[in-house]
Every structure is written in C-alpha cells, then in structure tokens.
Amino acid sequence: VAAVGTGVIVVLGEKLNFKGRSLIKNSFNLNSLGGMIRFLRSLFVATFIIESIGAALSFPVFIQQYTWWDALGISCFHSIAAFNNSGFDILGTGESLAAYTHHIWLNVVTISLIFLGGIGFLVIYEVWNEKWFWRTWSLNTCTSIFMGTTILIIGAILLKFTESFSWLNAFFYSMSARTAGFATIPLSSFAPVTMMTMLILMFIGAAPGSTGGGIKTTTLFVLLMRIRKAVTNKPEEMFHYSIPNSAFRKASIVFFMGLFVVYVSTYLVLMTNPHIPFL
C-alpha cells in the first residue's frame, strides 16, 4: 500500500517528501533514504515481470479446463494472489487448488511465486542489482534467503512425517502455510500434530518488507543466534556480519508481542465460541 501510494505521487509529478521517504524506508526495511525513486521503480518493474512470468507459466494448466479468456484471467489472478501471499480462490469451487493436488507444474509455480513474494522486495532489489554476487548482499538479504529456504525444507520434512503427504504436498504446505493460505488438501483431514506444525510456520511467517506476515524469519534468525551464543559462547556472526544487541532487543519484543497477541486472540475466540475445537 505504501509503495503504490508513493508511486502514484511520483507519477503525478509530485516530490517525495521526508515523511513519504521515511514511510517507504520503514515499510521495506531500507538502510537509508537515498535512492528511493530508483528502488520504487525497480520494485514495480520486478513485480510486473515476476507476476507476468507466473501467469504465463500457469496459463497452460488452466487452458485445459477453461476458455482462452477465462484461463488468461485465472492465470493472472492466481499469479498475483500467489506472489502477494493472499491465497484468494478465484476458481469458484470453495476448495482452493484441491483439483490440482498432484499437478507438479502448477504446484511448483505457486511455491516459487509465494517464495519470491515472501523473501521481501529489498531482497529482490539487491539480488537484481548485485547480479547474484552474494558477498555484496546485506545481512537482511542473506538472512531472508537462508531462513526462507531452511524453513521451507524443515517444514516440508516435518509435514511429510506427520501426515501421509507426498513430497510435493509437503513442500506446498510448508510454503503456503507460512503466509499464503492456498490449499490443495482439505485442512479438516489433517492430524493435530500437522496443524500444530502449520501453526508454528504461520507464526514465523515471511521476511521483512515482503507481502507476508508473521513475526518475520529474520526475527527468528536473530533469536537463534543469541541462543547459539548462550550455548557455545561463539560470537553472533553470520554471513561475515555481526549482529548488534539492538537487533536482539527488537527481535525479543516482536517475538513476545506476537505470542501475546496470538494467545489473547485465541483465548477470546475460544471463550466466545466454545463449540469451536482448539485445533
């Protein structure tokens, strides 16, 4: 929302004031106020390219069941929904992507779009400009990619061994559960341990400055680094960067505030709706 609003201001020829620059800086976890217009331009271009590619890759799947125009519209909508981690169902069946549970191509495309939307625009911007030379990336970019990939793999392994999933479904739900909300299998059929695993994934969420929610993968990373230091007495360093104490304080606040909000919300829902099961 901040990016679109600021983009409209720029298109109309208005200057981006300090307040607007600060809003963009905080929204996308930028390091400085410089190069804001270039960042926004790259953001819109990268988003358009990624969503267009996603729609083009999804089109051959939907054209098999829908007319040309319907397939085009569904492909575009699905690509945008996946990249923005919204999980909207446009198929009209009320079952999300259940009809494509075993469709490898569409599942992989959807996972890829969710992943790209969930690692954050700043990450995409840095990778786009640094030409994949990871040693020049910021700590945020390195951490977002590392944690996003690690959580995806660990989540898939846990889901695979707690439910009778195929590896395709395990990776799909490990990715979708964190922020997107797409479903290829009815959630009502899941075991309690599977639901608990998905709750943890949802609580973690995506990277800062992304289209996803949660406490953020970087928050979890900072807390894990502090735990490692307490156990091994090794310095809090990763990817040739050291982690300042201020980052740990912020991560702790976000983590415990997240737990508090989830607990209070769950308590109120269970209290006002006693007929709803806990899991």
Task: Name each model-derived stretch.
Residues V1-L279:
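Membrane-proximal intracellular helices of multi-pass ion channels
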